[in-house]
Amino acid sequence: MTGSVDRPDQNRGERLMKSPGLDLVRRTLDEARAAARARGQDAGRGRVASVASGRVAGRRRSWSGPGPDIRDPQPLGKAARELAKKRGWSVRVAEGMVLGQWSAVVGHQIAEHARPTALNDGVLSVIAESTAWATQLRIMQAQLLAKIAAAVGNDVVRSLKITGPAAPSWRKGPRHIAGRGPRDTYG
């Protein structure tokens, strides 16, 4: 036991390096690299000679300078508008703005007494809190359309459908049987 002792880990590594399968892999890799170099492509270096950074030697980083630049951080709202514009969502965003920011679009006083319910095919449905406000909004319809167009753009809302509050129901309970028809109940 005084001679040299072979470690099993060391023998395994040496056997692996001499195996015919590994030689085949190395040869195939060398052939692929040579073919890539012949085509003028980057042959790759594997793990051995990896570059510490992605910079090309001899090129310095250029700073954007004191003026605005495309690489400067952009406000989130601007980036969202550009994304909506690129993807063709501008009309949908404008429609959502009419419904979501109604008070800012038409003004505080009108927003207190009327609320939008739907926007379908350029027709904005608005429910007023009273018949008097519904009549007033119908009279002001041209001015309302101008305010909306100024806030969100033309052709988003082409017309308004203004309704008053729903009429009272005389039904009692969850079930209903058809009555005898309309009657003069106030007379």
Swiss-Prot record:
Record's compositionally biased regions (Basic and acidic residues): 1-17, 35-45
Disordered: region residues: 1-23, 35-75, 168-187
InterPro entries in UniProt: DciA-like, UPF0232_actinobac
Superkingdom of source: Bacteria
PANTHER family, per the entry: UPF0232 PROTEIN SCO3875
Stated family: Belongs to the UPF0232 family.
Protein name, per record: UPF0232 protein Mb0004
